[in-house]
A protein has these predicted regions:
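Terminal alpha-helical segments
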Residues: 1-144
Length: 144
């Protein structure tokens, strides 16, 4: 299990690391991390909305225990243990808020792809700044 508090700390730390890398013109690494900062924030909200008191489930048995005890609406662990930001947004309970208040920023962050880990020259300073600024606003909204 990953504690909800740990997910929040990781989200904030990855955002800080992304900014440091961006300021050092390490745009590929910065862009890669910024998406994970959003992912961690959304997963922390999933813990809250589904009352995952022991944390975010990492393995099938942990998830099955939650499902059996809470009767939650999530059918399988892969529904929430993934990098699909749209799917995570839905399960986080934040979809309406995010799309109402920060739709443009959400559309920008959806450019992110975990496969960026394997790609060179995915972005420049302008793209990095745009995605980073969007992520920062989104994380502030999601975690409030």
């Amino acid at each position: 299990m990953i504690l909800r508090e740990t997910l929040i700390e990781l989200s904030e730390a990855k955002l800080i690391d992304s900014e440091i890398l961006m300021n050092e013109s390490k745009h590929d690494s910065s862009l890669y991390l910024v998406g994970y900062s959003i992912e961690m924030a959304l997963k922390s909200k999933i813990c809250k909305i589904f009352n995952f008191e022991k944390g975010f489930p990492e393995i099938k048995n942990e998830f099955t225990n939650y499902k059996n005890n809470l009767g939650c609406a999530i059918e399988k662990l892969n529904d929430i243990k993934n990098h699909d930001l749209n799917k995570l947004l839905i399960y986080s309970g934040q979809e309406n808020t995010v799309k109402k208040e920060l739709l443009d920023e959400w559309k920008i962050i959806l450019e992110w792809n975990p496969e960026w880990e394997y790609i060179l020259n995915i972005g420049d300073k302008r793209k990095n700044q745009k995605i980073f600024n969007s992520a920062k606003k989104l994380i502030t909204l999601i975690l409030k």
